[in-house]
């Protein structure tokens, strides 16, 4: 009897990967080993439900790979250090976690001696590149299988296929592709395919339940979130969850991201990311008080590149480690507490309390009184500061420009 080929499928329990389990096991005759790399977006009951679904669909075995701490240490904290928002909007939630999921999946595939590795990405998005590139770099000898992409399947086709094979599910809910993670949740569906539409309220996993106002205090130590409303957290993942629980009930962090995909087309996705938006906003305000002008300028430059490389599947590029070293160094004085006021769908930054606050000095108060220089000092400084510009305009005048 011929031994079946062993394939590891990156499994989320969603429509595409559910189709892949059934298709690869029944149509292609593979032994399908499903694996979910949890970056912190799923609770224990949710993970148990995903495992049950995988086995019902025909998986030979299922593995849950817990990588939330690794994801924080190797990605999230650097995204906070860099205040990274793609196009000034999106905290690259899915973009960042996909690489770590791909790394975990391919390492598991090597561990069990798999012949192939599979994922459910379509041919029109970024994830196909993130998975494929990571697999190719870390295990070039293992075959990559992508049924959804290779067969150019629609969500409607996959739903119909599963129904015909007797698979029951909430197919109405499956009309939306929801990627839930520690650093935000993305929502894709028929509305995100059209520039003039947006997903309906019910498409979002979190619903707005809070009214009025609430004050929130976030404390940072060397750039990392250390306390929420005075409660200290040594586990940074739990600190993020605490902020998410507070902010999500106000609907904070909901938006539409429109960006350029790795493959060169425009893409739209809805998202909700209360914790990332609040943490980044507070962290950025604290940096304004504790970093010098040139620290801020150069950190912003490299952070933009870091976010772009992370989005475009370049996490394993060696320069990323160099950028991380600079981002880490920049945070040595980013310590203090930031207060915010939360309201339904928005928030206000109130102020900062930090012993490293560069406004709290004996040199002067902006727009008020100077204590470290005289009026004549300023007159002389201004005269020298304008020298080159004065020379330029003098030359222009002589040349009648």
Where are these regions (language model features)?
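Nucleotide-activated chemistry modules centered on ATP-dependent adenylation/adenylyltransferase
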Residues: 2-401
């Amino acid at each position: 009897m011929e031994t079946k080929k062993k394939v590891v499928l990156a499994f989320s329990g969603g429509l595409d990967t559910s189709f892949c389990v059934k298709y690869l096991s029944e149509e292609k005759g593979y032994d399908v080993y499903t694996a979910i790399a949890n970056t912190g977006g799923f609770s224990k009951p949710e993970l148990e439900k995903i495992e049950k679904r995988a086995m019902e669909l025909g998986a030979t075995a299922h593995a849950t790979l817990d990588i939330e701490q690794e994801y924080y240490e190797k990605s999230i904290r650097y995204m906070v250090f860099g205040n990274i928002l793609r196009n000034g909007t999106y905290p690259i939630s899915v973009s960042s976690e996909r690489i770590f999921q791909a790394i975990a999946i391919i390492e598991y595939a090597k561990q069990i001696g798999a012949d192939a590795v599979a994922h459910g990405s379509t041919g029109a998005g970024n994830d196909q590149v993130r998975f494929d590139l990571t697999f190719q770099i870390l295990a070039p000898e293992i075959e990559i299988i992508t049924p959804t992409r290779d067969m150019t399947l629609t969500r409607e086709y996959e739903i119909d296929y599963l129904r015909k094979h007797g698979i029951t599910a909430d197919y109405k809910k499956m009309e939306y592709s929801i990627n839930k993670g520690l650093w935000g949740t993305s929502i894709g569906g028929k509305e995100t395919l059209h520039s003039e539409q947006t997903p309906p309220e019910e498409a979002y996993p979190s619903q707005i339940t809070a009214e009025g106002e609430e004050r929130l205090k976030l404390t940072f130590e060397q750039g990392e979130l250390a306390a929420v409303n005075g409660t200290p957290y040594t586990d940074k993942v739990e600190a993020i969850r605490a902020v998410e629980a507070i902010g999500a009930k106000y609907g904070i962090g909901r938006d539409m991201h429109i960006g350029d995909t790795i493959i060169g087309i425009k893409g739209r996705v809805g998202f909700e990311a209360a914790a990332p938006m609040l943490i980044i906003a507070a962290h950025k305000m604290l940096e304004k008080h504790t970093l010098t002008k040139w620290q801020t300028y150069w950190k912003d430059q490299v952070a933009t590149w870091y976010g772009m490389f992370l989005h475009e599947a370049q996490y394993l590029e060696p320069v990323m480690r160099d950028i991380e070293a600079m981002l880490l160094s920049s945070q040595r004085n980013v310590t203090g507490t930031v207060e915010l006021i939360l309201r339904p769908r928005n928030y206000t930054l109130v102020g900062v309390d930090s012993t490293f606050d560069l406004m709290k000095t004996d040199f002067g108060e902006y727009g008020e009184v100077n204590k470290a220089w005289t009026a004549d000092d300023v007159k002389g400084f201004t005269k020298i500061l304008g020298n080159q510009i004065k020379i330029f305009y003098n030359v222009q005048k002589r040349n009648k420009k």
